Amino acid sequence: MQRMIPMFLIVALLLTGCTTPAPKPVSEANTYRQITMQEAIALMEKEENYIILDVRTHEEFAAGHIPGAIVIPNETIGTEEIAQLPDKDQLIMVYCRSGNRSKQASDKLVKLGYTNIVEFGGINSWPGETVSGME
């Protein structure tokens, strides 16, 4: 009987090492979150410290963009640090024209270490006002 107790403890310890880890939060799971346009609008109304990132070309941005957005074309996002986005934990809300480039850019940003990326599709579905120029 006394031999069974140590053996039981060893087996119990070995089995606890076989459990699966808890799922990682989104920010640690090397992914971004996709949300609807309505969810994006609600998030913009609720949050204060966020960046709206337009990943279309400079020409598309100048023709019309969401007020307050900055432009960093998808094609320029790569392996180098992005000076306009110094805080990798800040909420960055990404959009493009139809939703394709914003998904690509969001994936690239996550690979660069950004942890709070939200992709909300394209300006084609934006119900709010837009502004033109390179403000």
Can you describe what each PLM-predicted range is?
Residues 51-54:
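Structural scaffold elements adjacent to functional motifs in cytosolic proteins
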